[in-house]
């Protein structure tokens, strides 16, 4: 049985109690109750929980496996296929409890995007639910003279295809999930850092920079730097560890 977050804890406890230990239980995210609440717990590395039954990864699990991204690349919509290289995916977040996104922050991002456009890039831009109107507007203005697709919130979000088609990616630092998904591509990821932040976010981004997946977005991009790294697929790492520990406990089944 697999649960996610604190809301799943009563159900996990009930399953353990009524199955009398015959069910292997897993919780994703820190349950804030200590590590004994389940047989196995996954937390991101920037969280503090540790224990013999706790596994950690740098990024969170997501659905963008190498196989899925390869399939998406083979099935690109014509409007994305038509965009000239280099294609730059711009993934916009917004204000949260850690990052402020001042007007000056918005303008800094716009200046960086304008400089990327001058290098001949095309753009694939998608906002998130937290993206404030001014940030989207300045990103729109900064890229309007280049070939681009800017998702306006209507219809299905082409975000999965943007990840698959991108030669480079620009992601705002406020979302661990968006940054982790960008790093599933194995392509260069520039991270834009708004005002404030927190120690957890700083640790997370420093770790990704340390393993060579991301770099800070320069105020003015004079060239699109190339670097490579193994695509980061934490879901596969977690799944293998769940299977390994399950088999250690219950043995192989036929």
What are these regions (language model features)?
Residues 120-155:
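Catalytic donor nucleotide-activated moiety binding site of glycosyltransferases and closely related
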């Amino acid at each position: 049985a697999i649960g996610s977050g604190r809301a799943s804890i009563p159900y996990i406890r009930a399953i353990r109690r009524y199955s009398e230990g015959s069910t292997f239980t897993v919780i994703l995210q820190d349950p804030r109750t200590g590590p004994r609440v389940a047989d196995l717990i996954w937390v991101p590395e920037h969280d503090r929980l540790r224990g013999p039954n706790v596994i950690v990864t740098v990024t969170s699990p997501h659905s963008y496996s190498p196989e899925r991204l390869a399939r998406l690349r083979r099935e690109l919509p014509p409007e994305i296929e038509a965009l000239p290289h280099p294609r730059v995916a711009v993934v916009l977040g917004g204000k949260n409890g850690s990052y402020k996104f001042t007007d000056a922050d918005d303008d800094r991002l716009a200046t960086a995007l304008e400089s990327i456009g001058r290098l001949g890039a095309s753009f694939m831009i998608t906002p998130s639910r937290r993206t404030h109107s001014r940030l989207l507007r300045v990103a729109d203005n900064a890229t309007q003279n280049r070939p681009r697709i800017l998702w306006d919130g209507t219809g299905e979000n082409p975000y999965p295809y943007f990840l698959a088609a991108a030669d480079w990616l620009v992601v705002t630092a406020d979302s661990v999930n968006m940054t982790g998904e960008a790093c599933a591509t194995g392509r260069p990821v520039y991270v834009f850092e708004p005002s404030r932040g927190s120690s957890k976010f700083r640790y997370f981004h420093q770790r990704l920079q340390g393993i060579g997946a991301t770099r800070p977005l320069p105020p003015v991009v004079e060239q699109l730097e190339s670097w490579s790294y193994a695509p980061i697929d934490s879901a596969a790492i977690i799944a293998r560890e769940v299977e390994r520990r399950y088999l250690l406990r219950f043995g192989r089944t036929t």
